[in-house]
């Protein structure tokens, strides 16, 4: 059966690549996050198979597709996202960002790697598996919206409404077809400093909120950033802290009474989100104790815990076996960015990441994916599903 599935995917190579090209041409930058064209293409593809699916959403522009094969437990979830980051300056691109140009084996375009390649491969795997029913359990595929801006209308929507109850999760993200078992957590913070407005010619009559913010940010970078230096994890990159935005003031000749900054903090699997928040809270509290006139508020914009799936988890063991079958590296790696996997990992569901595309190409100009890697990923997903849900013969 394994050989037959691999051969079936190989025979459909041109169709799979053409499907991916169509997904790339269906622009879905977020913001605004309208993924209806992508969802229509996926729905059309699934409609031509034996796969049952639903389109679920509480916002029409941001649909989510939930497709299922088989029934009962265990449930294996394949998930990836339909939205992309914006193009930026189109003139900076050598290839039309929505042209899906195939140059050699490279298919170019926004979302080609992140993450429409994974989507195309997962759909192809489900198509192939639809010919070998019954499975011993359920294979679920979700093609979600809103991942690039936090997943509220996508995976979080599906999880919070009890639509998904997987026992194992595979997140389609750009890992260069490497098995990733760990991922850094994400924490976005907003800091607001308060001052007192005055005329720019008499700043001593006011209190400058931007100056206060500079003190706050300098202390955070020095103390929190300093504490992060030297921290490591065997799989993920180091923890990080970055000032993302800053704004304040209304005019050059007015002492600003308000300033806002946002921070991007990425945590190691060995850290917790509450600990990371407390680090920043302590810095602000110390500044206020030293100078009670300094007023700063801290708010969590969004957060997601890190992922670290044990290497003896069945999904990891199965993924390693499939990687060896396809002559791929089987040593686990870490994933640098954040993914929708956090919604499952925080609920204790064993979660891994795997997908075609080089991680360094995410969100870049002239993004591309090697189509050979897309076909390999489709084979990986299909063989993994067979190993998890195909019965004892397929696990041997």
Sequence positions of predicted segments:
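Acidic-glycine-rich active-site phosphate/pyrophosphate-binding loop
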Residues: 87-103, 166, 181-192, 321, ...
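Acidic/histidine-rich catalytic neighborhood of metal-dependent amide-processing enzymes
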Residues: 115-188, 389, 393
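Active-site metal-coordination/substrate-binding segment of hydrolases
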Residues: 75-140, 365
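Short helix-capping segments at alpha-helix termini
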Residues: 49, 131-135, 163, 286-293, ...
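Metal-dependent amide/peptide-bond hydrolase catalytic core
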Residues: 1-4, 11, 54-57, 181, ...
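N-terminal helical capping/dimerization or prosegment-like subdomains
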Residues: 1-90, 105, 258-262, 279-282
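A structural signal for isolated positions on well-ordered beta-strands in alpha/beta enzyme cores
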Residues: 54, 77, 140-142, 297
């Amino acid at each position: 059966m394994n050989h037959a599935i691999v051969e079936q995917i190989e025979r459909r190579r041109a169709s799979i690549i053409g499907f991916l090209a169509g997904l790339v041409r269906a622009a879905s930058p977020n913001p605004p996050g309208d993924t209806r064209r992508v969802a229509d293409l996926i729905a059309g593809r699934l409609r031509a198979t034996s796969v049952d699916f639903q389109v679920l959403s509480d916002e029409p522009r941001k649909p989510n597709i939930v497709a299922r094969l088989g029934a009962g437990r265990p449930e294996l979830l394949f998930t990836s996202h339909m939205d992309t980051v914006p193009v930026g300056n189109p003139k900076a691109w050598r290839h039309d960002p929505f042209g899906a140009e195939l140059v050699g084996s490279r298919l170019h375009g926004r979302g080609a790697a992140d993450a429409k390649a994974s989507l195309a491969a997962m759909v192809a795997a489900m198509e192939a598996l639809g010919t070998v029913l019954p499975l011993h359990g359920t294979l679920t595929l979700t093609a979600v919206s809103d991942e690039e801006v936090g997943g509220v209308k996508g995976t979080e929507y599906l999880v919070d409404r009890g639509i998904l109850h997987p026992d194992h999760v595979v997140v389609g993200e750009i890992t260069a077809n490497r098995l990733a078992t760990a991922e850094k957590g994400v924490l976005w913070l907003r800091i607001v400093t308060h001052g007192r407005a005055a005329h720019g010619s008499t700043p001593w009559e006011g209190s400058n909120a931007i100056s206060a913010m500079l003190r706050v940010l300098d202390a955070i970078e020095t103390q929190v950033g300093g504490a992060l230096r030297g921290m490591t994890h065997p799989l993920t990159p180091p923890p990080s802290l970055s000032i993302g935005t800053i704004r304040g003031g209304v005019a050059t000749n007015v002492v600003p009474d308000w300033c806002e900054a946002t921070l991007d903090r990425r945590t190691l699997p060995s850290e917790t989100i509450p600990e990371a928040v407390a680090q920043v809270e302590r810095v602000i509290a110390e500044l206020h104790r030293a100078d009670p006139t300094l007023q700063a508020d801290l708010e969590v914009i969004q957060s997601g815990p890190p992922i670290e799936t044990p290497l003896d988890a069945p999904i990891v063991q199965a993924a390693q076996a499939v990687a060896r079958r396809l002559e791929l590296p089987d040593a686990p790696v870490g994933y640098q960015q954040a993914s929708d996997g956090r919604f499952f990992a925080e609920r204790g569901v064993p979660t891994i990441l795997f997908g075609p595309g080089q991680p360094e190409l995410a969100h870049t100009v002239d993004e591309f994916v090697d189509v050979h890697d897309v076909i390999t990923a489709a084979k990986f997903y299909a063989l993994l599903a067979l190993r998890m849900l195909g019965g004892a013969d397929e696990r041997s």
